[in-house]
Amino acid sequence: MNTMAPPPALMTGADYRESLRRYRPRVSVDGRWVDSVADDPALRPGINAVALTYDFAHQPKYAPLMTATQPTSGRTVNRMTHLSTSAGDLLNKLEAVRLICQETGCAQRYLTHDALHAIAQLSARLDDASGGRERGDRFLAYLHRVQDQDLTLGVAMTDAKGDRSRRPHQQANADTYVHIVERNAKGIVISGTKAIVTGAPYMHELLVMPCRNMGEADADFAVCCAVPVDAEGLTIVARPAGRPGERLEHGDALFSRRFGQSTGVCLFDRVFVPWERVFLAGEWEHSGHLTYSYATHHRQTCIAARAGFGDLLIGAGALMCEANGFDPGAESHLREQMVELITIVEGFYACGVAASVYGRRDEHAEVFMPDPVFANIGKLLLATKIYDMHRLAHTVSGGLIVTLPGPDEDHNPETAGRLSDVLRASPDVPYEQRIQAARFIEDLTAGYQGGWYSVISLHGGGSPAAMKQEIWRHYPVGDKVDLVERLLERGLSADPARAITRNRQPGRCCDSGCTQPGQPMMVSLPTNTKATKSA
């Protein structure tokens, strides 16, 4: 009797680590070749962060948020590989990313989610242009394999770019951009460089995508495909994740020794990609749409990621106030700083929520697209306010976070006792807890890791200039002009094509109404069990 095979099981964090041992990528870190990515201490904090996205999918408290049912297969998949088909799905994704980044600072796997959405939209667009179904079927087969194997995909989008004043085909060195060097009946061969690839060493596969809108002369550079991380001809030159095993000025890094992020420069040297893994190969006129789709999804997701980091700063700031002997609720100067920090974090996160609620179904695919205005406003706010977030954490904490004696003094019999007595601020908080809170904030905001969070917040997902461009491109300025001209009872110009009225946004605050959120709606969020018990 024939029986159906059971559906694939979602991996745990331990399964993910073990799966990495089945790959043999060519990875260099700090000038040495890595024998086993899964076992290398320099990469462990990054692997820990990704592993948490697997473990949370198995915890009853988090599983409703961290898993979803894939409509095209009916299977339960990890939220990070699921395609959103409603505004509720976008909200669930937002909360899931905030959850995992509260624990890890940056869980990285959400890039998989964003890239799969962009390629789904691209594939449907290509099929509609050709009148066929080949691209959609190809992508769906790949998607189901990724979901069934519970893979983590890296996004290889940012090219080395070379001379920024020249287009890809004009570069003196063509390998500053990834491009197609050969086509045959079995697939394509690509060469070139992707300069900034998040988590590259400990991904299962890389999704190669164009980083800009290509012209007809750049057709060979318009390429999107999936490449196993250990493909022949691929070399990854990476930096360590976090600060594993490194003694800093104020002791071991309390957070970044556990969680961090590696990035890698990916060098492609005649890497063969079979056609079933190719999603764009020379269709230059669609490259800009792919880049735009990914950027919109990713900028909304970044909002949630940095809100999770903001939660860490809010909690650490409140702890430091307490350790210093103050109740921020009773001290106006501290309360004002804490409320400003909360306002920043929840303010840009609210833009992510709005981007979900006002999201729209893609005109070609079944997936939902976040509203680009709110997605870009939220990302712009977090990019520029990350420095204020650090400043506020520093203000409520005091200078102790960078002036503490080193941890060796904690064990020096000639100084430890006296330091414990004189550096204790509150009778209710032991000295050891005060210095631990101080060193935690130092790690997050005032050391290497703090600078790293600032830069990835500013430039990750695109520069502030790119976000401002998208906000202006999509914001309905024309509707506002019409409003004022109607109140003035006359138009200032009879030209309907004048520049300031080109941008219009149907469906929001207009006759057609807002787009329906769709189903399923947002799942119930996990409750804080500690808070519930104390209440």
Predicted regions, residues:
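Buried hydrophobic positions in well-ordered alpha/beta secondary-structure cores of metabolic enzymes
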Residues: 31, 190-192, 268, 338
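Internal helix-loop-helix
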Residues: 55-153, 205
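N-terminal-proximal low-complexity accessory segments that begin disordered
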Residues: 3-56
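Long, well-ordered mid-to-C-terminal structural blocks that present hydrophobic/aromatic surfaces
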Residues: 309-312, 316-388
